Amino acid sequence: MYSSSNSFLNPNAARPGQQQYGQPQQQYTGFQQQQQPTGFMPQPTGFAGGQMQPMQPQPTGNFSRGPFQQSSFQAQPPQMTGYPPQNQPFQPQQQQSQTMQQQSTPAPSLPARLPGQTSSQIANSFQTISSPTTGVNPHHAPSKIPTQRLSFITAQDQAKFEQLFKSAVGDSQSMDGETARDLLLRSKLPGSELSKIWVLSDTTKSGHLLFPEFALAMYLCNLRLTGRELPPSLPDRVKNEVSSMVDIISFAVPDDNPPVAPKTNVPNFDQPLMQNTSAPPAPQQPQPQQPSNSQLLSQLTAQPTGFYNQATGFQPPSIVAPQPTGFPGQNASLRPQATGLQPNPQATGYTGPRPPMPPMPAGFGSSLSPSQTGAPPLAAQPTGIPGQWGFVNAPATGLPNIEALKQRLMPQPSREGGYTTAGLAGNATIPWAVTKDEKKIYDQLFRAWDGLNKGFIGGDVAIEIMGQSGLDRQDLERIWTLSDPHNRGRLNMDEFAVAMHLIYRKLNGYPIPNRLPPELIPPSTRNLDDSIGAVKSMLSQDAEQRKVSGAFFQPQKTGVSYLKTHSFRTGSASPGLGRKDATVFKNNDDDVVAYKSSARRRAGGTPSPSPSSTPAEKVDNDLSVEQLKKKIRETQIMLDATDFRDENRAEEDEVLNRRDRKEAESLMERIRRVQDDIDTDLKAAFRNADSGAERRALRRQLQAFQDQLPELASNVRKLERSIADSKLELFRLKDAKLHPGAAMEIIGTGPGGAVTEADRIKARARARMQARAAELAGRPAPQADDGSAARRLEEEKATVAAERERHDAMTRDVEESVKEFSQSLEDSLRDQDENSTRDHERRRWEEALGVEDQIRDLIFDLQRNRRTAKVRKEEERAMRADNSSYLQPQARNRSPVNDDGRRRTSPLRSASASPSFAGLSHEERVASARERAQKRIAERMAAAGLRPSSDASESFPERQEREKREKEERRRRAEEEDAKREAERQKRLAQEKSPVTSPPPKPSSKKPPPPPSRKVRTDVTESVEAKKAEDSVVASKARAEQEEKERALKQEQEAQEAERKQLEDEAKRQEEELAREKEAAQARLRALEEQVRQGKIKKQEEKRRKQQAEKEAKEKEARLAAQRAELEAAQARERELQRQLENMGEEESSSDDEGPIEITPQTSTPTQSQVLPAPFPQPSPPTAALPVPAIQEPDQDVAREPSPTLPSPVETPEPVKQTLPPETESRNPYFRQLSQQSAPSAAQPTHEMQSTNPFHRLAQQESTSKSAFTTDATVPGPLERKSRVRPEEDDWSAAESENESDEDDDRVAGGSAKQLASILFGTMAPPRPLSAMDEKTESKAQSPVQNAVVTPPPPPPAPEADDSPEIEAEREIADMSPAAPDDAGFYTPPSIPPPPPPPMPGMEASAGAPPPPPPPPPGDAPPPPGGAPPPPPGPPPPAPPGPAPGPPGREAGRGALLADIKAGKGLRKVVTKDRSGVATAGRVL
């Protein structure tokens, strides 16, 4: 290839083993030319010898033209030949060996110069430092260093480096390796460091250093000299700056001015281009090229013979044909001749393997090279200038696999992936530039893929084309980057050719360059960039010249244009070419073929139609028939192309229209969804509040209010005046009544009856006359007026006037504030008024004025949907109102609390709506009225979507204080309401539980079925309510639909009809669902009733068994009473007590720990002696008030807990009424009931809350019974009649306590003794009453009353006992029990035999003794040691007295205890025998 503009930067950068065209060819000593053909005769140039010997350089011609350069050719040294003034030697070409070396061995007699060293060789040369050789630098144009600043060095250092660089390179643009080596060695750095510096500095790897690279090398040397380490690689900033400056220097070198090569005997093909660069040379006869190196080495036929031709101006006498030389003007007639007698034409010069030759200008005789003569035809030769496309022929070896590449890359109907380089790869010699054949193939590929004639190929298509080559993705990415320098994402025809050429080179083993060489830069891009640069330089030079010469201030008057001296071409325009440059363009109207009116430039005598025809008509007239036909065909082709282009454009427009329609449809669908969201939003009512009509209505309403304001203020002032007059009149009357005769009656004659000074004078005169008349008549003188009444009246007047003034000021303030507020409202309404443009736009999109039909349909559809959503919302609002009005009476019927709550909330609502002004001063009333007015106006504005201006009269701290006060007031009112509500609830609960005192039913009679549960009633009621609500919804929807039908248009009626049908279907479906729910609720109700009935039957059977057991118990009790009568009283009792006390330490059980701790049982714990048989009606002595658990009615229990899983009827206890302070309670009624029951046991921290799940409680009870069986727990006394009712918080069931009593009767004696001891030491009571109580408990243990349920008549309230905390707690707990003893389980049947005779006094005393408490619930902590009593529980509220009778008096016989103990021992087996029969009594299974 020809030497490019920057070929001097990298003379050996081509493929290894090849030399770039235009570079000095290096000769090697590895191949000596020994054999000479004998047919050659010595050339008559004055030298003898038939064979070539190594010769010294022998310059010929004029030596004054310049020094010659030493070449590296060993076999044939260079010789200066030719005409001396041309200063260009003939350069013979020598053969090269197959294995080419980069450096030749210098001859001993000549100093070695290494002109072709690579960057790596120069870097290695630093390792073995030796004295460098000097050489002569080639002649270059003056070096120009860009003014760009390098940031990694200072400006002073850069100036020094520039001076050093210029002094070292002279006029050259680059510094060769030897010079750089000399300079770097002066730093005295080791060779390894200098080698690293060279590798980092030579960024182009060309063996030369440009100025930025040289400055970088100096910078790195300075780093190393200062002791810092060299970086392994250059920083990105430094690298970018250096490469940018290198590019600027490289691109500044013009393509048509290559550097002068060293003067050698190699032919210089660039010389013809130096003569006239403005006109490109014509293609000339190319030189033949050898096919391959192997043929050359095997044949060795092309040998230089004799001495080289020397054009000395004369022709030597020889057998060789003369070679004409001479001046450039003679070159047209000269013909190059072969130098020798060869049987065949043989090429001379360089005959080794070489790449295809780039375009070479030839035909000028200034630098003739040896060429073949003889037999034509002539082979094609690459011609042209560097980088010019279309003049580069294919190499002699051809372009292998180019057709295969074309066939693969052509569009095919079915292609498959997975392409490889098989069949495309090779090792052909490919030049840098694109050859003619390649360009033709690449253009065909481009046109085949560019079916729409767009002029470019997109990235997706290029990926498909380039991917079929089989190259790696990384290589294709690099090729694309080089081909698309402007990053446009597409390739035109030239850029596509560059990409295909790089792919073809890569397939043949060539590396992909980092930067696109100048030969591959497309002409359009390069010429455009060069033209822009030339224009810029010309403009800058012209401006500089005019500024220096002062031409800016001297207008040009001569009319001479100097543009002819400006040209894009460096040389002057050739006169014979006739080509114009853009700088000397002149418009010629005659060349324009267009219509020209004949009326233009019409002279006076010229006829109207001009007889002369236009040049275009002349041209048409001169055309022949064939030319006209050709023109017609061309026009037809153009018309066809236009039609095809129009069709393609129409198709593209149709595609775009379809895409636009799809997008428009998607947008309209999104608009509909957004409109639906807006319509269904809760705040959609405020959406249209900002319309113009709404604002105008608000302004009219505001104006009406403003008109009413003066009248209201006048009325207020009149009222104030009348109030003031009334106050004065009232004061006069009161003062006259308090001070009779003190005031003078003064009749006012002033305006309005006002008293004037004259009236007062007259009154005083009248008073004096009356006094004188009384004195004359002897009557007592009337009381003289001392002026006190007048003073009091004046004071009152002043007070009334001041108050009136104050009220007037307040009225004015209110009036002004209302005016300001109304002004702000008016301003806000006026600011939002729409102008004509906005109104037009609003009407356009809201009323569909001036829009397309499709948009109009969309707007109407949105409006219909909006109206439908509005109607639906109104119906839902009406339905909610109907539901609320329907649910209120239902709520009143269902719960009596609702009336109270409604009565409580309605005053609050009315108070908030119209607050009472009682007890407020006038100022406070005015302020309240003002605040309410502002609040209403603010609410209206908020509903209208307006923002009124903030009230500046109230500061931020004042507003905070006011809000804080209001918040505190609301909280206080809420607390009061909660307290009232809680009190009413407690009262209602007490009314529900206490009045049930009906006589107990007979055991044989069947209980009435319990009422359905509240939950079931609620479900039924709610279902009925829902049904009615749905009916009302359907009716309201029907009415709304009817109204909508009357208003809607004809096309809207169909949509409304469909919607009505849908709503009817929905209503039917909802009615069916309600019916199904109602049936399910009825089924559940029937199931619950059946379960209740079965439970009652089981309960009756249980009652019969208990009655039978009760009979047996009474018989045993009669026998026990007879035995107690026969026992001794005092002595035996004392001995037995002593024995029990001694046995306390011997028995170890849980009763020691748990017995005494529960002296005061909890509300939820079954207690002792709460139900006594009827034969003992004596009142309770004041010893102790026994606690009684809550006894609940079975009807209420069943009604409240209708669990369908219960196998047997179980009465769950009703919560014990307890009233706690409202602030400490939860507002959940169920939670309050639990907290009320657990409040008395709050003093014991170990008590646990139990679950309300019946199955969970069953498991707890079973675990509790098991623990009671395995532990020595304290059991209640056997005489006690257990209640099967268990509170919700109770961990012990009634049945469980009975089982424990039955199963643990064998430990009753020991447990009773321990309990007696605990009671004795805990209550500090006398031992005798405690013994009597224990005796009574032990004696009653023999009775099986616990297995039967007897209901005694309601006993009288327990009398007051002593003030011990335990007794008080027991009394309070007993008081909490309800007074309803109508449980069927506690009824005493009439068949019970009469009780035995009354026992002894001791027995009477022991009858009501408090039994030991039952064991605490599981998890309770053990009692404190020593049997200390627990702290008393918190005081519960009073409740109706329980049914348990009071215990007997403390005084009892001492023998009763001994009899009780002995009887207890005998009762063990009896009770144990009967426990199986009553094991399930009262237990929840």
From Swiss-Prot:
Residues 647-737, 1024-1150 form a coiled coil. Residues 1453-1470 form the WH2 domain. Residues 1-10, 302-315, 328-349, 882-896, 1247-1273, 1340-1349 have a biased composition (Polar residues). GO terms for cellular component: actin cortical patch; endosome membrane; plasma membrane. Residues 788-819, 827-843, 871-880, 921-939, 956-991, 1016-1031, 1038-1139 have a biased composition (Basic and acidic residues). Transmembrane segments: none annotated. GO terms for biological process: endocytosis; endosomal transport. Pfam families: DUF1720 (PF08226), EH (PF12763), WH2 (PF02205). Disulfide bonds: none annotated. InterPro entries: DUF1720, EF-hand-dom_pair, EF_hand_dom, EH_dom, WH2_dom. Residues 1-119, 253-379, 596-622, 773-843, 868-1485 are annotated as: Disordered. Residues 189-224, 471-506 form the EF-hand domain. The keyword Cell membrane applies. Residues 280-289, 997-1013, 1174-1184, 1390-1401, 1409-1448 have a biased composition (Pro residues). Residues 157-245, 438-527 form the EH domain. The keyword Transferase does not apply. Keywords: Actin-binding, Cell membrane, Coiled coil, Cytoplasm, Cytoskeleton, Endocytosis, Endosome, Membrane, Repeat. Residues 16-59, 67-107, 290-301, 1160-1170, 1235-1245 have a biased composition (Low complexity). One of its GO terms (molecular function) is calcium ion binding. SUPFAM superfamilies: EF-hand. It is a peripheral membrane protein. Residues 1144-1156, 1288-1306 have a biased composition (Acidic residues). Component of the PAN1 actin cytoskeleton-regulatory complex. Belongs to the PAN1 family. Component of the PAN1 actin cytoskeleton-regulatory complex required for the internalization of endosomes during actin-coupled endocytosis. The complex links the site of endocytosis to the cell membrane-associated actin cytoskeleton. Mediates uptake of external molecules and vacuolar degradation of plasma membrane proteins. Plays a role in the proper organization of the cell membrane-associated actin cytoskeleton and promotes its destabilization. This is Actin cytoskeleton-regulatory complex protein PAN1. It comes from Coccidioides immitis (strain RS). The lineage of its organism: Eukaryota, Fungi, Dikarya, Ascomycota, Pezizomycotina. The gene is PAN1.
